[in-house]
């Protein structure tokens, strides 16, 4: 390791010279507001002024700027269910201010002039369904009444405001397909699906992973950990679920819940099936493992039970006494599905085709 800067009042030592390249080398992103990119209107974001960002060997200070589909690197409009990434680009001209591009590419924008040396990913967002809420974040109908007539369908297609992230305001894991719940916690917008690498992902229109793929509570935790996520506890899950409509016996209008359904379905397809935190399918489709355990209060035969062959034994008051909570409801549970629906009788080693998982992650 060598010295990058030294003191030399005569400036004969190159290390004494302060250059843009040197400043860029020691700079990261400095901003008074971590969330320096924010949702501002339908289909629009605002970059706040004053953030200092190094891009390659250049340094920019942001001016207040509105971003929209006009900043896309290819298409003319945002596509439903897609994750987008925001790039600050250096076109190499000292006379030019920063250039912003929005791309579906997670490495650098499309265009022969752009690569990882002259662009920097500074944020992103998800585009999909958004539940309309009042100033307190409560579910309302089109007249503004909390849970007033027709509130369930008061949903629009837009940038999910709480999915907007920056390099400073984001989860510790990959932020794709996630939304901010508050208090330093992010949640998957969609039920988890197999990422093809023995982990989990939050992706629109995917098939939710369940016991059909061998999932139980233990395996759900392991797969979540591989991608830097975890299972929510009950309080966290309830926050994510708030404002998602109760299921219906005879219809899939408010979620994949009709009692005539026979199997899970692709995630994110039902417009009304969304919470005030813009979390999809949390009531219906498949139950969700929760990081909350309890014991059967009626059991009294304490002993070692070999319920997980090859993984050790559990000392508990019966062979099925240890339970892990599941929440939300499944495809055929009808009115039993909802934002506070919980079942307390599933053993964590159970492999059920109707139980999946949704992950959360703490803020960086």
What is each residue range found by the language model?
Residues 18-81, 92:
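Glycine-rich, flexible loop motifs
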Residues 85-89, 186-188, 277-278, 358-362:
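Residues within well-ordered beta-strands of beta-sheet-rich folds
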Residues 197-198, 290-305:
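Cytochrome P450 core scaffold surrounding the K-helix E-X-X-R motif
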Residues 213-215, 311-364:
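Disulfide-stabilized, aromatic/cysteine-rich ligand-recognition loop
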Residues 132, 136-280:
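Short aromatic-cysteine micro-motif
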